[in-house]
Amino acid sequence: MLNIQRFVCNMIRENCYVISDSSKECVIIDCGAYYEEERRAIVDYIAKETLKPVHLLATHGHLDHNFGNNTIFEEFSLKPEVGYGDREFMKNLKGQAKDTFGVEVDYDFPPVGHFFEDEEVITFGTHELKVISTPGHTPGGVTFYCEDENVAFTGDTLFKGSIGRTDLGGSMFMIINSLRELAQLPDDTTVLSGHGESTTIGDELAHNPYMDR
């Protein structure tokens, strides 16, 4: 069984997920923790549950999904893993802070530790996450899909009732193709996105104007 803990982070309410299983190994997805209390909440949860973080994953390279990477690196020696197409975003996280979010950061971000290949499999504990290339919101956006638990972490590609914007280095053509890829998942797949509440592939096919097969 997969345990999923959501943390809503930073000034635009980004969803960070800590997922674990009975092995106590865990994966941190999209650590957007900006404020100190958000960072401590994630670290304290990991300590309380006696978890062992083994991967720091990012669905894409926008700063709101990576604010807290330095804390995870300092606490657990994990570097972020991200799609290769977002390498330039990851090199310029400090620039994003000032230009996009209007804030200054007085710390350095850890370098990327690994760039994903499409359909790469990430293992932790007794579970696997399949990397699905879903560009469009950004050039290197990915979705993490756990087939055993039928859950997809879609970042900012797919939201409940909507999709991610494409004017920050993305492409509408690419995101529509990515949505068609996600539409091939089972209808009862739980979708956990980068912002907002959960949904399912079936609900999005029924109600999201951007989704079809």
Report each predicted region and the residues it spans.
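Short beta-strand or tight-loop elements
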Residues: 2, 112, 118-120, 125-130, ...
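Conserved beta-strand segments of alpha/beta enzyme cores
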Residues: 3-5, 52, 79, 114, ...
